[in-house]
Amino acid sequence: MCEALVSYIQRWSEGHLAALPDNLMRSQLPLTLFQSLIRTLHTQNQDGSWGSSNSAEETAYAILILKSVACFSFTEMIAAQVETAISKGLEFILTRSQRSPTDDQLWLDKTLYAIPTVSDSYIMAAVQAEETIHKLAEIPYKLVNMSTVTVHKMTEYFSQLPSQMQTPKWVIQASAIEAILLSDRLKTLDVFSTGRPLGEKYIKMAACFWTLANNSDPECLLSTRNIYTMAELSIGLFQEDDLMERSLAGLPDSAIPVIADYIDKLSHATNLCRDPSLHQCLDGDNTPPDMDEEGLTRVKAIRQNIDLWFRFVSDENLTRNTSSSDRLDLQQEVKMATLAATQRARANRALSNGNGHSTTEHITVLSDQNFYTWLHTSAVHDVKSAVVSKALICKIGNGGDVFITAKEKYLAERLWRQMSVEGRLWNDVGSIERDRLASNLNSVNFPEFSSPQSLKLDGDVRTQLLQLAEYEQKYTLSCLNDLTQILDNSGRRTISLYLQMYYRCCVIYNETCAKYAFGSTTAM
């Protein structure tokens, strides 16, 4: 397939063949060929072979792939890795003195077969095939605009994260390139049709959270479709968060219960995307009688945006392979996250109005909740980490519940909550100053952090928050290990690996929040 696609692109570039539709030429083809390259590179064994049985024939397949798509290396670092991999593969083949009885027995569907003449043909082809890396070096750039400056900046950015210190630099660089290729489609995402999609630089970074987490361990790679939809959801979350924050900021407190009631009704509705009559019953007016025309218009717009958000997250393409209970679980999480946004709007308004004890550094919020209660209730849902968690479960489901027993379901829910708690803390570590300037509620606004005892014994507010984030991180790992051990012991290693990949994605995001104060205004 790789040889055929590269041959087609070459003939097209010479004017001998017509172009395919633009989305295939500019997005799908380069992404497919680049992924073929890096995933083949990533799965080579230490002895230079490929596959679990050290097969010369399977190694020949891999060498043929690398030789045909080497021109899609994009950088000198990856090109050097390709050349080394090909050299090691050829050395493995050429230094074998004899064929063992099981050397080249390969599975084809449900059949174990071995045809020595066919095997020898592939091996000879791999040895003699011409490398395309120099001959076709300009071909990829006729399809995509790959800025090597951006690639190198992203590589340096992510290689400085604690979790990536041991990751080979070429893997980080390959993940950055893969994210850039994915962003060609992601940059058009505008969930609420505001005409204000996120900046391309931010989108590339958000996509790289997923590609880097996926590529960091090649044992079980999430499909391109799933990686794309999860990156799409992550970007959609930032659009929703920004829009809801701006939309709710100017509403009077009397309008918040109206929005909350609509969210509650919407979450209990069935066949949301397919039943137009549903919206008639949801449009029942319970707005305060004293609300002016402008307020009514804003409430209506917020309702419409909430409707769009529920549709986006619960789209059939996202959840068609999941069980009804996992789908319901996701919908309920979206409800709780959206309700939490209304509570945050009230808290932010209180901060903006100076409703608290002000110092030169920050305002200490006046609240009927202590910090722990707030963090483990509304803040857990407001961070929306569990929405992403449960959307991923819907993506990897295969018709039945992903988690089967009561214990598994309990541990999974505990893990989502724990990851949300930890994520909120890391997010607040990196956004103390940004939140202060924007009058957004941050963990350090709670009085526990500014008490004389806390400041004296545990350090400034950022240091205190950092200590709590590190404390919660230990319990997240404990929850993850408990759940993955059960999955491993019950023959569901693939699900276990997907969860570990997702946790790596969260760690990468948390580290960027703490180290770089990452946000939707991040530029590179």
Where are these regions (language model features)?
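Inter-helical turn/loop segments and adjacent helix faces that build the functional surface
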Residues: 11-20, 69-78, 316-326, 393-409, ...
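Acidic, carboxylate-rich catalytic segments that either coordinate divalent cations
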Residues: 462-468, 487-524
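Divalent-cation-assisted or electrostatically stabilized phosphate/pyrophosphate-binding catalytic cores
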Residues: 371-379, 407-417, 432-483
